Amino acid sequence: MAQGKVARVNGPLVVAEGMKDAQMFEVVEVGEPRLVGEITRIEGDRAYIQVYEDTSGIRPGEPVFGSGAPLSVELGPGLLGQLFDGLLRPLGEIKEITKSPFIKRGIKLPTLNREKEWHFVPKMKKGDKVEPGDILGVVQETGLVEHRILVPPYVHGKLKEVVAEGDYKVEDNVAIVDMNGDEVPVKMMQKWPVRVPRPFKEKLDPSQPLLTGVRILDTIFPIAKGGTAAIPGPFGSGKTVTLQSLSKWSEAKIVIFVGCGERGNEMTDELRSFPKLKDPWTGRPLLERTVMVANTSNMPVAAREASIYVGVTLAEYFRDQGYDVLTVADSTSRWAEALRDLGGRMEEMPAEEGFPSYLSSRIAEYYERAGRVRTLGNPERYGSVTLASAVSPPGGDFTEPVTSTTLRFVRVFWPLDVSLAQARHYPAINWLQGFSSYVDLVSDWWIKNVDPDWRIMRDFMVRTLLREDELKQIVRLVGPESLAEKDKLTLEVARLIKEAFLKQNAYDDIDAFSSPQKQARIMKLIYHYNQYATNAVERGIPVKKIVDKITVVPDIIRSKATIKNNELQKYDELENKLKAQFDELLKEAGA
């Protein structure tokens, strides 16, 4: 293993000499405090190291110790419900040891608790043939998640020994595999390098929607399990609240929340609210399915890159167990800014706006780790990693490099509009700029499981909103009175779509989460309102009279916050009222 000396210190970048045996991306310990760093460039016997802790006080001549291994994380029981820093060190345990709210430099703590015992139930027996990814046994980690202990990738052979059911620590051997004459011990935990994607048998097309309970995300711009999404938006437009809604209410079995360079208060909000909130799909506390990686804005800049890779590696580990995983990163712009900072210190040739020229390949590497896969091992199982990331363009400029590069690699775009946020329209997703490439892929699921008319109603709503935008231009020029009655109706229906469907209060107990069935019922009411009103307009009834006489519309708008997901029969009453009022209107008009 390489051992050298510090030659130069420039913020989080340390240049060490005498490192001719070092390797790219090798983890090293820098200086007397033994700060963790990673080699990002080698020139002769000089190694350029990005240090993941504060380098204050490190001086030339101090030793640098190589580890001979890349940056790796521990994977096993004990991850769920925990809060870690960007290097996957447990923050709760660090606080207990240091008795301080701050992380001391050079502190080394394993990710997984070595003393805690887990109840292991074997699923294979002595003499069985094992392949990478086979389920050796299970541990009930939380009330919500059964942790499956897998044969590590690249281990195969015959099971020479497997322990009996009982309580074991993560470092205990639970099996011994005879691999071509060598005895390979298998522990409950395994290590994996964060920059290397975990292997799988086959990548599949995403076909099932990842339901989020947020109406505009589920219906207008749906994301599939194994999909990629970006949420760009300026300061104050609601990125964090939208991502928190995703992590709270989405149908994913596991949620990895990575706070990358954002304010610490946002992680605090999550930590305070998650233990109290119940998962709407299972009724269990949300924290039982969540892992939080906190790398806030006051932590070292270089560790932002580590936290992004750590988050996606955790997601792949749970995916390999056969789970649908959602990884939420807030925000990838801060990671890109860290790359720019380090690139500048390493005197690399800058590209657009000072970002390094390899920005696009790094962003692509990250998003390419999403997907729905058939995993290694038996029994056959399928898992997915869905990546949803916030992007924070300065001043809301979507043409800046991070946003425009991200757009090339994601298939769902949820752009936040500050003018909608100022008008108190939340979530402030611009329905004219956004897009989803998964609509065709997930339509079959909605049609089969929720409503046969789902695609017709969804397309009608999108068409109405686009037409409303065209009509607004005319109204600005010549005023609303010049419009034909059918165009006035389009404006009224678009208003109803926005008020009754697109607007959603993330802090309302009922409105925060809409089941797929509830979403379809609201859509159906709006669709029928349009049909009945179009019929009335064709019979000569002016739109103003329709608006005055159809008094059930405010009830339809309020229904999102008054009708619970298990009270859908109340929509039948609204449907009957709507029909009765239109029948009465037609009778009065003699049409």
From Swiss-Prot:
Signal sequence bounds: none
Gene expressing this chain: atpA
Family matches, as CDD domains: ATP-synt_V_A-type_alpha_C, ATP-synt_V_A-type_alpha_N, V_A-ATPase_A
Pfam families to which the protein is assigned, alphabetical: ATP-synt_ab, ATP-synt_ab_N, ATP-synt_ab_Xtn, ATP-synt_VA_C
HAMAP family: ATP_synth_A_arch
The reaction(s) this protein catalyses: ATP + H2O + 4 H(+)(in) = ADP + phosphate + 5 H(+)(out)
Family annotation (InterPro entries): ATP-synt_VA_C, ATP-synth_a_Xtn, ATP_synth_asu-like_sf, ATP_synth_asu_arc, ATPase_F1/V1/A1_a/bsu_N, ATPase_F1/V1/A1_a/bsu_N_sf, ATPase_F1/V1/A1_a/bsu_nucl-bd, ATPase_F1/V1_b/a_C
Organism: Metallosphaera sedula (strain ATCC 51363 / DSM 5348 / JCM 9185 / NBRC 15509 / TH2)
Annotated compartments: Cell membrane
Oligomer status and interactors: Has multiple subunits with at least A(3), B(3), C, D, E, F, H, I and proteolipid K(x).
Protein name: A-type ATP synthase subunit A
Keywords: ATP synthesis, ATP-binding, Cell membrane, Hydrogen ion transport, Ion transport, Membrane, Nucleotide-binding, Translocase, Transport
EC number per UniProt: 7.1.2.2
Primary localization class, coarse: membrane
Biological classification of the source: Archaea, Thermoproteota, Thermoprotei, Sulfolobales, Sulfolobaceae
Gene Ontology cellular-component terms listed: plasma membrane; proton-transporting two-sector ATPase complex, catalytic domain
